[in-house]
Design a protein with these regions (language model features):
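A short acidic, Gly/Pro-enriched loop at the edge of an enzyme's catalytic core
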Residues: 164-174
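A short SAM/SAH-binding and catalytic strip from SAM-dependent methyltransferases
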Residues: 173-184
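A short glycine-rich, Lys/Arg-flanked "PGG" loop and its adjoining helix->strand segment in the class I
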Residues: 188-199
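Acceptor-substrate binding/catalytic loop of class I
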Residues: 207, 226-244
Length: 291
């Protein structure tokens, strides 16, 4: 087995260079998921776990955005500036531009659209985009945009493309759920994602941790024994430890920048520093990266 840090650290010499224009797409994985494309909206089928996880993800995103908004409000109030409004409305993503990389059949993309975001779903599999587009078109409550580059709140557009092909565009929120473990050159892919985020924007990631338990659960049990997931869907060698992910983003300067903020907290009118960030946000890089 490779050393635990090999998968990301082997790309460490590339840190500081411009994002590569070459695609990180793994053709074998794209072919695999293209064969499964028609299963995306079968909630008892191949992707049942993703449908269940989607509800948790949406709630997680809401909680994180609320925490960041609360911190920003405290900073603004301490400096006598207009404070941003809290995220209390049901459509808490209203007005946000969101890019969902590796959107598959559109499970998260549709949910975010209903919450008010201007969503662009991107997948390297044209078959996945076909399924996502057809499913969205069947729902009259979803506003499907003709042009992905247009900004229309509570709307949805799909593109059959790689993340690298979007160079030059930026979004308030970028998501990549269960994608990192399916790409070539994960470090270049993550740098690409970082370049697609607007200043002050947010990146949400979800991936498999490379542990014995994850192998047992996602490959031995789900693929080999129960066959609820098609064999070959996952490769344990491509899973990434959370600390590897955090170390990678630290190498980009994200976490040290956060520490600078914590070291110079603004003062309240009575002269006391505002409350420190919640411990989870200190670890996850406030308002930027969530693993």
């Amino acid at each position: 087995m490779l050393p635990v840090s090999r998968r990301l650290v082997q790309h460490g010499r590339l840190i500081g260079r411009a994002v590569h224009t070459a695609s990180s797409v793994d053709p074998s994985d794209i072919a695999h998921f293209s064969r499964l494309a028609d299963e995306w909206w079968n909630e008892q089928g191949e992707f049942a776990a993703l449908h269940t996880m989607n509800r948790v993800r949406v709630q997680f995103m809401r909680e994180k955005l609320q925490e960041v908004r609360g911190w920003d409000r405290a900073v603004a109030e301490s400096l006598g500036r207009d404070a941003p409004s809290p995220l209390n409305s049901p459509d808490f993503l209203h007005g946000c531009s969101m890019l969902d990389i590796g959107c598959g059949g559109g499970i998260l993309a549709e949910s975010a659209t209903r919450l008010g975001a201007c969503v662009t779903g991107v997948d390297a599999s044209a078959d996945n985009i076909r399924v996502a587009s057809v499913h969205a078109a069947r729902d009259p409550s979803l506003h499907v945009r003709e042009r992905a580059e247009d900004h229309v709140p509570a709307s949805l557009a799909y593109l059959a493309a790689s993340a690298e092909s979007l160079a030059g565009r930026t979004y308030d929120i970028v998501t990549a759920m269960e994608v990192v473990e399916h790409v070539n050159q994960p470090a270049d892919f993550l740098r690409c994602l970082a370049s697609l985020i607007k200043p002050g924007g947010h990146l949400f990631l979800s991936t498999m941790s490379r542990t014995v338990f994850s192998y047992f659960l996602t490959i031995f049990l789900a693929e080999d024994m129960l066959r609820v997931v098609t064999p070959g869907t996952h490769r344990h060698s491509q899973y990434i430890h959370p600390f590897e992910m955090v170390d990678f983003f630290r190498s980009l300067g994200w976490i040290p920048g956060e520490r600078d903020v914590l070291a110079h907290r603004p003062l309240l009118p009575n002269g006391t520093p505002i409350a420190p960030l919640p411990p989870r946000l200190q670890y996850e890089t406030r308002g930027t990266m969530y693993v």
